[in-house]
Amino acid sequence: MAERVVLAYSGGLDTSVGIGWLKDATGKEVVALAVDVGQGGEDMEVIRQRALDCGAVEAVVVDAKDEFADDYIVPALKANALYQKRYPLVSGLSRPLIAKHLARVAHELGANSVAHGCTGKGNDQVRFEAAVAALAPDLTSIAPVRDLALTRDKAIVYANEHDLPIEQSKKSPYSIDKNVWGRAVETGFLEDPWNGPIEDLYEYTQDPDVLREATEVTITFEAGVPVAIDGIRYSPLRIVQELNAAAGAHGIGRIDVVEDRLVGIKSREVYEAPAAMTLIEAHEELEALTIERDLGRYKRGVEKDWANLVYDGLWFSGLKRSLDAFIEDSQRHVSGDIRMTLRGGRAVVTGRRSETSLYDFDLATYDTGDTFDQSLSKGFIELWSLPSKISARRDLAVEQAALAADDATPAAAPAAE
């Protein structure tokens, strides 16, 4: 039996050509694996058949939408994950999930290697291969575009010569990746960071400058997990889908950013993530209501580290697992409702409530009925500022001693003629 390689298959030009290209270059039989993470577009059965028509000996389709939402999006939401404070890890979250299924299918079908369609200058090559290395160190990773000189021009020629059943479109200059958590667009005229994005670039969001009647939503969380919209309980996947539609209609979640790639270059990216940005805003607001100040402060640093690890392809690392444990414990009391108004590109929080709130109205109010004993503040301030007072006295004493020493030093006699 010939050796096999399992290819992460999208149905597009590069991975469709990659089936035959891999076979020709390595002599291996190619198994195509298409993973549905909510990217929409073509029916997955059509994609499966295309892989077979392009020469795959088998084509496997995995519906991983719920798994993606439950096991990848929800942890990211609990971590308020935004790489460099802007990017909600649209591609960074899906790659370890796809890699997990690559490794699983490879073992089930007796393959000794896996392959992906990433270039040699992006982050995704690292994400795929680092994940496979962590899950299945016995497997070899192959990247036809990077390792086997499969350029886009060569792919188009190959597709024409072999009459492959794919649309070989040169019309779109963009590289696009999408899933239910968001959509990423790069290359083309966007490579000049001075060029502004045009409206035709967007798919998940409407123009935020075209004002529509505001939409009000109430999102319910239980232990950091979104469980309902306007009192109707949904799965995490359904909540993301509902908010993509509701927030996207108001142009919420458009992100235009220059980010630092893991491979050392800067890249201009345009993202659409209406549900992601709405949910993160709501979750952060609920945390502000329900967790202690020191825990919240410390968690902000953990969130940054968590996002960096995921962006860098270390989803299955020991440090990431340890940070997960901390974040999970921090969410014990993050339950309640957040009311938001969606309009004009913004998701604005207008109300928050929780049975586990740390907000005490009687302590916070300045009106009659205030239970905060202000007389205690004077002593608190004395103790709080005591280290500063002591160090200031020390610094002043040292400064005065230095000045006194300077005054006591006799002036040098003038040199003789």
Curated annotation (Swiss-Prot):
- Any one Gene Ontology cellular component term annotated for this protein: cytoplasm
| InterPro entries for the chain | Arginosuc_syn_C, Arginosuc_syn_N, Arginosuc_synth, Arginosuc_synth_CS, Arginosuc_synth_type_1_subfam, AS_cat/multimer_dom_body, Rossmann-like_a/b/a_fold
Its GO biological process annotations read: argininosuccinate metabolic process; L-arginine biosynthetic process; urea cycle
Molecular function terms from GO: argininosuccinate synthase activity; ATP binding
Catalytic activity as recorded in UniProt: L-citrulline + L-aspartate + ATP = 2-(N(omega)-L-arginino)succinate + AMP + diphosphate + H(+)
Q: What is its main location?
A: cytoplasm
Q: How the protein assembles, per its UniProt entry? A: Homotetramer.
Q: What is this protein called?
A: Argininosuccinate synthase
Gene from which the chain derives: argG
